[in-house]
Amino acid sequence: MKVLALRHSVAQVYADTQTYLHDDSKDEYENAFLISNLTTHNILYLNYSLKTLKILNKSGIAAVEVQSLDELFALIRCNFTYDYENNIVYLHDYSYYTNNEIRTDQHWITKTDITEYLLPGWKLTYVGYNGKNTRGHYNFSFSCQNAATDDDIIVEYIYSNELDFQNFLLRKIKERMTTSLPIARLSNRVFRDKLFPSIMNIHKKVINVGPRNESMFTFLNFPTIKQFSNGAYIVKHTIKLKQEKWLGKRVSQFDIGQYKNMLNIVTTIYYYYNLYHSKPIIYMLGSAPSYWIHDIKQYSDFTFETWDPLDTPYSTIHHKELFFDKDVNKLRDNSVLYIDIRTDRKNIDWKEWRKIVEQQTVSNLNIAYKYLATGKAKVCCVKLTAMDLELPITAKLLHHPTTEVRSEFYAILDVWDIINIKRFIPKGVFYAFINNITTDNVFIQPPFKLKASPTDYIVALYALSNDFNSRQDVINLINKQKQSLITVRINNTFKDEPKVNFKNIYDWTFLPTDFELKDSVITSYDGCLGMFGLSISLSSKPTGNNHLFIINGTDKYYKLDQYANHMSISRRSHQIRFSESATSYSGYIFRDLSNNNFNLIGTNVENSVSGHVYNALIYYRYNYTFDLKRWIYLHSIGKVAVQGGRYYEHAPIELIYACRSAREFAILQDDLTVLRYANEIEEYINKVYSITYADDPNYFIGIKFNSIPYEYDVKVPHLTLGVLFISDNMIHDVVTVLKKMKTELFKTEISTSYTYMLSDNMYVANASGVLSTYFKLYNMFYRNHITFGQSRMFIPHITLSFSNKQTVRIESTRLKINSIYLRKIKGETVFDMSE
């Protein structure tokens, strides 16, 4: 949902939009809670409070001040990610298609012939990093830029087996227009750009697990982050290949040689980072035109020193000349060298051309070896061709996508490779490598071993759920790692499936109860964003490829109502209750009935079950932003710091009742996942609370009334406010609690309206208005380690007779309390108090 804050109402009516007027009788937290549970996507918030907006944003719900109709229209017509700390809106708005344009944030693409393959009459527009060049389009009170681009389509095309770009583009745009927005993927770059600077400000040693190409620019400013990926393809791996011949397959209709060079350089930079943890100088031989340097410099400042007879417009220092073997001594330490020398073929006969290429390959290798032989902190990426060749067995082979699959590939060499064993590789094996293997990641670091690292902060986004990892090892890592942000795929199946298909692999699935954590927050993508200064206008879908975000060692753990909080906890319930359910009271009725409480009078105001826990369980797919286990645990240890809102402290038994209701709901819905989740949450409640039951009680608390509006034949009709199992020396403690609660007990507004047979030969009257006081009393006794209440549901009633009677219905009648007493069962009254 998105909350757009206005000082004045607007005449225009928008679809899926609701107006909320700030309620001055409630504080900012309660207003935020009420807003978060509204069911429309767009909320126009009038007479707004800035503090309420802040509360919503910290909860991950995008809430933006709007000063004009232009701002309102821009935000209401699309989704966005909001940097609420810096007041920047990142739109995810594809309405630019109506200008017959596609967009890119990569400059090199604009220098290709891609426009020849666009839809008829369409153009390509460069919008800069995260759309920053579009800021001039929006003269708003907040900074605004449109981060939507079509780079995902272009990159997917490059890695696909399809050649017809126009058809591919058309199909993908039609898909985009007919499917829900992949909001998490679109906002992820904004998130990473906030996440890693904030982590690096606090933690010196950071590990990042499983980065992919979409993060290739994110980490350029963080050379000390240790990356782990799927490892490199090295020369010794070619032993498994059978020899093949030249294929000559075209990969892309437009020229992507620039993209290939950029990927080679970025791969080399990250390889260097993992060895030396600092930024290198980048030397390039055969550099022209390297328009992609502009893209890298948009993200991070590097020194590019280049050699080529042709211009290299974006290099820092350019030598418009050839580079020879004798020039190697010009290259300094702490650098990477990219050798991309290849003479243009022009009209040369292919046999003659082949000789030239092989000579240049040998020359390129000689330059690489000479460069690496002296000095320190050096890495080289060198262009090679398929030919009979000796290479170090540990050399890293690269084959990033290029316009045509021909004879070209690259190798990354470091100072250790050149002193390692070399292996002779025949030309046909290199062709087999070129023809069959495409390097699909600029991160070629070794795989991560699933072991905790006490001195490091571990980030693993979308990296550990794959079933080639041991599920238990993933759980152990998360349980043991003190400082981390790790995601795992949430089990949002209905059959409690332990793993699910994703593309061509399988992912393990997880529930919050799979982990045993303290000082950790388990939330959704939205909830995680709120913890790092961002909010989002569209929540994750309840089904599909969604993840739990587990933040270990966060200083926000005890800020229960600020982050990963109960905002939107009832939103799904409201959507159901006020649309398709039998009555808007359905949830209240079901919760009482499923716990054998048949007095439904006032069920919506006096419910016997925690609605928070019940909704968090049965609708967990919609509201797992709320960290239920953390909420339960902090209540159990009495460390709930609440800044505002209408706070009600649940008795532990209310939480148990909620689990029982959720369990019955799951059985009726055939939802095996909720069934397990409810069972495990109940187990967790029993683990963190020391709940004891007076199932064999020896004392009870009774309430005597001035008068009863029914006939009775018991000596003194009374309401049993609860039973206890105590030793006689604990009577004083019980009396102390009753005295503390005296005012509240006598203020309890108890009423009755009918009689019924509670069981055979037990005729009783109902008593409404009791439960809230009962649960408060329960909490007081619990904190004082006094066993109070039974394991079965407490049903307030007034015993009238021990024989069968006809039921009676009367107008609801208020009962005046005469006295409250503590009596031994089948014994004497040991304490009595009157108002």
UniProtKB/Swiss-Prot annotation:
TM ranges: none
Segments of this protein annotated with the region GTase/RTPase activity: 556-692
A Pfam cross-reference name: Rotavirus_VP3
PROSITE patterns: SAM_MT56_VP3
Keywords: GTP-binding, Host-virus interaction, Hydrolase, Inhibition of host innate immune response by virus, Methyltransferase, mRNA capping, mRNA processing, Multifunctional enzyme, Nucleotide-binding, Nucleotidyltransferase, RNA-binding, S-adenosyl-L-methionine, Transferase, Viral immunoevasion, Virion
EC numbers: 3.1.4.-, 2.7.7.50, 2.1.1.56
Catalytic reaction annotation: a 5'-end diphospho-ribonucleoside in mRNA + GTP + H(+) = a 5'-end (5'-triphosphoguanosine)-ribonucleoside in mRNA + diphosphate; a 5'-end (5'-triphosphoguanosine)-ribonucleoside in mRNA + S-adenosyl-L-methionine = a 5'-end (N(7)-methyl 5'-triphosphoguanosine)-ribonucleoside in mRNA + S-adenosyl-L-homocysteine; 5'-triphosphoadenylyl-(2'->5')-adenylyl-(2'->5')-adenosine + 2 H2O = 2 AMP + ATP + 2 H(+)
Cell compartment(s), UniProt: Virion
Keyword S-adenosyl-L-methionine part of the UniProt annotation: yes
Region (N7-methyltransferase activity): 171-245, 429-555
Family assignment from sequence similarity: Belongs to the rotavirus VP3 family.
The protein's name in its UniProt record: Protein VP3
Biological process according to GO: symbiont-mediated suppression of host innate immune response; viral process
Originating species: Rotavirus A (isolate RVA/Human/United States/WI61/1983/G9P1A[8])
Region entry 2'-O-methyltransferase activity, spans: 246-428
Region (2'-5'-phosphodiesterase activity): 693-835
Quaternary structure and interacting proteins, as annotated: Interacts with VP1. Interacts with VP2.
Keyword Transcription: no
GO MF terms, alphabetically ordered: GTP binding; hydrolase activity; mRNA 5'-cap (guanine-N7-)-methyltransferase activity; mRNA guanylyltransferase activity; RNA binding
Domain writeup: Contains a bipartite N7-methyltransferase domain, a 2'-O-methyltransferase domain and a GTase/RTPase domain. The C-terminus contains a phosphodiesterase domain that degrades the 5'-triphosphorylated, 2'-5' linked adenylate oligomers produced by the host cell in response to IFN stimulation.
Role noted for this protein: Multifunctional enzyme involved in mRNA capping. Catalyzes the formation of the 5' cap structure on the viral plus-strand transcripts. Specifically binds to GTP and displays guanylyltransferase and methyltransferase activities. Has affinity for ssRNA but not for dsRNA. Capping activity is non-specific and caps RNAs that initiate with either a G or an A residue. Together with VP1 polymerase, forms a VP1-VP3 complex positioned near the channels situated at each of the five-fold vertices of the core.
Catalytic machinery residues: H718 (for 2'-5'-phosphodiesterase activity), T720 (for 2'-5'-phosphodiesterase activity), H797 (for 2'-5'-phosphodiesterase activity), T799 (for 2'-5'-phosphodiesterase activity)
